[in-house]
Design a protein with these regions (language model features):
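Glycine/proline-centered helix-kink
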Residues: 158-170, 229, 298-299, 416-424
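Small-residue hotspots
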Residues: 93, 100, 116, 123, ...
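Membrane-helix boundary and inter-helical linker elements of multi-pass secondary transporters
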Residues: 50-52, 57, 82-83, 105-108, ...
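Helix-loop-helix hairpins in multi-pass membrane proteins, especially solute transporters
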Residues: 82-215
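12-transmembrane solute porter fold
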Residues: 19-36, 41-45, 56, 60-65, ...
Length: 478
């Protein structure tokens, strides 16, 4: 059953100003740590490989370690937030980030550094699902409708930090060496902890005991889910030479996880809820597909710029920077939209147009024209990110919004993993014009399918704002 709780009476804030700067600042800072760490490492890999005499494949584990851990930890942290209280889990994540910052500064080997990245993945994964739970409960307590602008700010923070992560990593590495990429997490985490204590109210409910808490956390479900993700990822990463036994293990784990979830009173992955809540399940699929295209552009186009036209990494970053900046701005603009359906239709049409533009580029295309041709990719990124986030907010059951938000991020990382596999399959050893054009046509087909599926999905609400604010759930945080 649920976790036994003791309820304390707290002062309910007014609806006006409920999502102001003080309330949003720690949530935004925490939510930025995962995306910035996922990209900041990219410009430090060469220096790390040189210091530890490691190969490209070995240093690649620093990237994969964070992605795999985050894909598993996001829904896990969301589940814990639903059980323990969002503020507690948010703070616990920041403590782990601070610890990782210290450990990374003094890591003696590459293996130790990989474990530091795993620790970073766990710690940074706490912020987003707990932030969604905190926003949901704040709206319930104040009688506010869905905080679309606040959701837009969270999306903007995530997208903007992805854009500046590589540049920030390069600056830090240049100033103090690659260890600065890890050290910087310590002051950021400490600042976040301070802001949480100052501006985020304490959780309203308190767990009565660890034994009853353990009964509410499906450990076996988490282990099976982790195994499913790992084996599925290893299969996708070997698409050039498919590892069929790995696929068989993944399918078997999926079957066992499904049976376990259906037989468990409080499953980690609520298969029954996902099966009955088709709109939420479709949102996960749609978000994974849009992120597949986003990561294809983030990694594929950047690699092609350096291999095809032969630009330096700095110039390649400058060419893609306007696209990333537009994505962040469009996420903020999406926060002002009340609809979910219309922005998603517009966004998927934008992906279709943007993918068509990529078909036109060649190695001889001028840099200024390349900026203009890839710029359209920024607009649908922000709009679709915000709209899908808002969809989860209104589609997920109130008592499971933390877990649901974590699964949304998991679908994002699955999209990233599939994108990496697709790029390896299409690019081979070196990105070429032909490989880039093939990738563009794949994205044209995928975005066209998304347009059709989105237009046909009548479950998407035209109006995102609920008629009545949800009531606070027992055990919710403020």
């Amino acid at each position: 059953m649920g976790v036994a709780i003791e309820t304390t009476v707290v002062e309910t804030p007014s609806a006006k100003g409920s999502f102001g700067f003080r309330f949003m600042a720690p949530l935004c800072l925490g939510s930025m740590l995962n995306p910035v760490n996922s990209t900041m490492i990219s410009t430090a890999l060469v220096a790390i490989a040189r210091d530890f005499q490691a190969t490209v494949a070995e240093t690649g584990l620093l990237i994969g370690g964070l992605y795999i851990t985050s894909a598993i930890a996001q829904p896990t942290m969301g589940r814990l937030a639903d059980r323990l209280g969002a503020r507690r889990v948010f703070l616990a994540g920041l403590y782990l980030v601070a610890l990782a910052g210290v450990a990374g500064t003094f890591a003696p080997s590459l293996r130790a550094l990989i474990w530091v990245r795993v620790l970073l993945g766990v710690g940074t994964s706490a912020a987003y699902p707990t932030a969604m739970r905190i926003l949901r409960n704040r709206a319930a307590q104040t009688g506010s409708v869905e905080p679309r602008m606040a959701l837009g700010i969270l999306s903007m923070c995530a997208l903007s930090t992805v854009a500046i992560g590589a540049a920030l990593g390069g600056i830090l590495t240049g100033l103090g060496g690659w260890r600065m990429v890890f050290t910087v997490n310590l002051p950021l985490a400490l600042l976040g902890i301070l802001l949480v204590f100052l501006w985020i109210p304490e959780d309203e409910a308190k767990p009565a005991g660890l034994r009853k808490l353990a009964q509410g956390v499906d450990v076996l479900g988490i282990v099976l889910f982790a195994g499913l993700l790992l084996t599925g990822m290893f299969f996708l990463m070997s698409l050039g030479h498919p590892n069929w036994p790995m696929l068989a293990v993944s399918v078997l784990l999926g079957f066992v996880l499904t049976r376990h979830s259906l037989r468990t009173k409080q499953p980690f992955l609520n298969i029954r809820m996902l099966g009955s809540n088709i709109p939420l399940s479709v949102t996960y699929l749609r978000y994974g597909a849009t992120n597949l295209m986003m990561y294809c552009m983030l990694y594929g186009f950047s690699q092609w710029l350096q291999s095809g036209p032969g630009y330096s990494s700095t110039k390649a970053g400058l060419i893609t920077l306007p696209m990333s900046a537009l994505a962040a701005l469009s996420a903020l603009a999406g926060g002002r939209m009340k609809s979910i359906r219309n922005p998603l239709i517009f966004g998927t049409l934008g992906f279709l147009f943007a993918a068509g533009c990529i078909v036109l580029i060649t190695s001889g295309t001028a840099a200024s024209l390349l900026v203009l041709l890839v710029l359209p990719f920024g607009l649908p990124q922000g709009i679709c990110s915000n709209a899908n986030q808002a969809a989860v907010y209104v589609q997920a059951p109130h008592e499971e919004v933390g877990t649901a938000a974590g699964l949304l991020r998991t679908s994002q990382y699955v999209g990233a993993i599939v994108a990496s596999s697709l790029l390896g399959l299409l690019f081979g050893k070196h990105p070429t014009d032909h490989g880039m054009h093939t990738l563009a046509w794949v994205m044209v087909v995928l975005s066209a399918a998304l347009v059709i599926a989105t237009v046909a999905d009548r479950t998407l609400p035209c109006e995102a704002l609920p008629r009545e604010a949800p009531q606070p759930a027992v055990g919710a945080s403020t």
